[in-house]
Amino acid sequence: MSPKLLNRSRILEQTVPVFAALGDETRLRLVVRLSTGGPMSIARLTQDASVTRQAVTKHLQVLADAGLAHSSRLGRESVWELDLEKLGAARRCIDGLSAQWDGALGRLKKFVER
C-alpha cells in the first residue's frame, strides 16, 4: 500500500468512532448544545430534553469514548465539555472525501463533454 493510501486508511480508522458517535440524533443534539453553550452539567443538559438524565449520561459516555467530550468535577457536579480536536479531524476527513468527489465529477464532466 502506498504511503498516501496508508495515511488515508489511518485517518479513516481514527474517525470511524467519531462518525459512529455522531450517528445518533440525541448525541448530535448534545454536541450542538455543548458547542453553543460551552461546558454544561448533566442537569443543565437534561433540561428540556426528551430523554432521561440516565440516558444523557450514557450518551455523553459514548461521546467521551469517541474522544469528542470529557467531564470534570466542579463541586458535586460533573461538567461536560467538547474536545474539538476530534471534530476537526472528522471535518478534515469529510473535506478530503469532498475533494475526491469534486475531482471525480470534474473528470466525468470532461469525459462526457468530449
Set out the residue ranges of the language-model regions:
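N-terminal helix-turn-helix DNA-binding core of bacterial DNA-binding proteins
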Residues: 2, 10-52, 66-67, 74-92
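C-terminal structural segments of small proteins and small subunits
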Residues: 83, 87-111
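Short, hydrophobic-biased segments on the C-terminal half of alpha helices
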Residues: 60-61
